[in-house]
Amino acid sequence: NIDKLPPIDVVTISHAHYDHLDLPSLKKLYKINKDTLFLVPMNLGKLLKSAGVKNVVEMNWWDTITIKESLITFVPVHHWSSRTPFDKNETLWGGWWFETDLSKLLHLGDTGYTYDFATIHNELGPPDVAFIPIGAYEPRSLMKNSHLNPEESIQAAIDLKTNKAIGMHWGTFMLTDEAVL
């Protein structure tokens, strides 16, 4: 129940796809806590604002914002963005790097395999924990450029030199042809 959540300081959105951006949920979150800050990819803010969510900051790749002594950086990944058949790549997409004095966390959102993983490591260092997507990867002929399969997810963890990798983006929505893990 969304009403039972504690106050939320920040919500990050990776891209516009419906499985990553549920407007009714964001509207409810904003309604119960108008102080929540919504960090979104460039050009996606107008969608949230049109739904009544006003506390929105758009970010470009490598933009960093400081919130309560935490650094949050929007990082590039290999994906795409749209909400309709007519708005492909009109908004940006990406992952989120969270850094405090105690730890570094990386959430990759959706991504295909890319040299950006090594670049993220070179720019920001190794994450203590990386949330790496492993779902919606079959058939490879269609999904290779936008979703990691399990083997590529392992290579992403190696490229990032993360201390711990946690697989995500599987078993929630039946999006493609792979078997449920």
Regions found by a protein language model. Name each.
Residues 47-60:
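Helix-loop-beta element that forms the nucleotide-linked donor phosphate-binding surface
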